[in-house]
Every structure is written in C-alpha cells, then in structure tokens.
C-alpha cells in the first residue's frame, strides 16, 4: 500500500512550484523597474496606495519587498505569480506609519515570458492588515482559484471599539485576465466591546 501511494505522488504532475532561482533575479528586475522608486534605508521599493484607498494622508507610501514567487502553466504558457507586501511609510516624517488604522499593502504581479524576457501581464493590489503592516509573510498561501487562475490568500483581522473581525483576503487572476481582490469574513468577536463580561 505504501508503494502505491508513493507512486501516485510521483506520477501526479506538479501544477505549481516555487519559482526557479535562475529567473528570479530577472523577474525582480522587471518588478523593480515597474516600481522605479527604491528606498535604500529599508531595502525596498516604494508604491503608492491603490486608487480606491481609504488612506487619509497624501504622505503615505508602502515599502514593498518580495514575499512569494510561484510558476504555473496558465492557458498553455509558463506564468509567474509574484507577491510583494509592504508596510506603510510616512514620506514627510521618514518613519514607518504604525497607527492602528493604517494598513499594509499586498501586490500581485503576473508575468509571462516572451522572446526570452519576462513581462508584467497583470498587476493588482489591496490594502490589508493593521498597525501599518500587512499579514506576516508566512501567512500567505498560494492557491488555485478556478481552472486557470491562481493567487494568494492570507488571514487578517482588525479590532475597533472592542469588535474584532477576521477575514480571508484573496488576490488572484480571473478569466478576464484581471487581478481581483476578495474578502471573506470568517470570524467576529465583540467580547471586548462589553468588557469581556467583567
């Protein structure tokens, strides 16, 4: 029985794998060119908040670093899914913005190779987290979301006025070749609102 199970694992094709190192530097160079705003003090690239952002200050940008990189075959082509996350950074004060209501940022880049060069085909972002930070790097999971679509998901939570809401936050490609974001609430606890019944 153990041999049969082992053979099944060997025979099954790997649909998604960690990206090979030989292309990683080339992919990161393409993304660095997209950002084109390095912040040497934190060894990151600066990104503006999304257009639909609720960020109150014009001074806030995000200090982005690579978190995950996976290769899949999508619609018959080798495709890279690269996730960057970053903390909120106050450009005027030159410090991390760590207010409770400040979120971090997650950005998904989808790249395809043409004529031996990687190019960004889709890009999308979402504000996520609290205290100026996104979900921890280890929290992000690579998931398949449909026959030819993949993305990343992480759990995040926010507490305000004693009420904590927990959610699964997705960034993924859809059949229209766009990056979508989705939030599924999977927990709520308002016990602190009532003083934990003390």
What kind of feature is each model-predicted range?
Residues 80-86, 90-92, 96, 149-157:
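Short beta-strand elements that form the blades of beta-propeller/WD-repeat-like
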Residues 19-55:
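Short Lys/Arg-enriched alpha/beta "domain-start" segment
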Residues 10-18:
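Hydrophobic h-region of N-terminal signal peptides that target proteins for export
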Residues 2-8:
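Sec-dependent signal peptide recognition
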Residues 101-113, 167-175:
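Beta-propeller blade signature
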Residues 56-72, 134-142, 198:
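Signature of short aromatic-glycine-proline-rich micro-motifs recurring in repeat-based ectodomains
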Residues 127-168, 177-198:
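Short aromatic loop motif centered on NTY/YTY
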Residues 111-131, 178:
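Short beta-strand edge/turn micro-motifs at domain boundaries
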């Amino acid at each position: 029985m153990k041999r049969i199970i082992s053979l099944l694992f060997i025979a099954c094709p790997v649909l998604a794998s960690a990206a090979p190192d030989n292309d990683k530097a080339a992919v990161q160079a393409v993304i660095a060119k997209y950002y084109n705003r390095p912040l040497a003090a934190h060894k990151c690239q600066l990104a503006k908040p999304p257009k639909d952002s609720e960020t109150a200050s014009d001074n806030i940008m995000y200090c982005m670093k690579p978190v995950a990189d996976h290769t899949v075959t999508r619609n018959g082509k080798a495709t890279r899914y690269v996730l960057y996350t970053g903390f909120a950074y106050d450009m005027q004060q030159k410090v991390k913005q760590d207010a409770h209501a400040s979120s971090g940022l997650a950005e998904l880049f989808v790249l395809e190779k043409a004529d031996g060069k990687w190019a960004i085909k889709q890009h999308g972002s979402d504000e996520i987290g609290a205290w100026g930070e996104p979900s921890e790097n280890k929290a992000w999971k690579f998931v398949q979301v449909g026959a030819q679509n993949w993305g990343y998901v992480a759990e995040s939570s926010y507490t305000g006025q004693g009420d904590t809401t927990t959610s699964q936050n997705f960034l993924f490609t859809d059949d229209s070749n766009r990056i979508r974001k989705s939030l599924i609430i999977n927990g709520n606890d308002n016990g602190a609102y009532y003083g934990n019944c003390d």
